[in-house]
Amino acid sequence: MMPTLAPPSVLSAPQRRCQILLTLFQPGLTATTATFSELNGVDDDIASLDISETGQEILRYHQLTLTAGYDGSYRVEGTVLNQRLCLFHWLRRGFRLCPSFITSHFTPALKSELKRRGIARNFYDDTNLQA
């Protein structure tokens, strides 16, 4: 009897890591290995490997650490400046590697958080941003 193999993810490793990091920066979202596994269409082992590689990359380039909480959720820790620089860097990568993720997941979450906080709509309204 042949073991059942999961089909490979349609996303490359850099795309998966980009989506992992941008998910960690989404406001109000608790991200676990299961979250990343479902998001990227991979099993938990590959998701764990991607999380580890993402953590190594942000440590090397941005002096940030990726820590796991007691409930299995992950978060990015470091100075506010390093976190912002990291976010901008990965947003640029995201626009190149996985633009559909940014438009369908990241942007709506960010807009709803800005609305919830009472930020003036003209800062995030699509009509004004197109001008």
Q: What residue spans do the PLM features occupy?
A:
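Inter-domain helical "communication" segments and dimerization helices
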Residues: 1-131
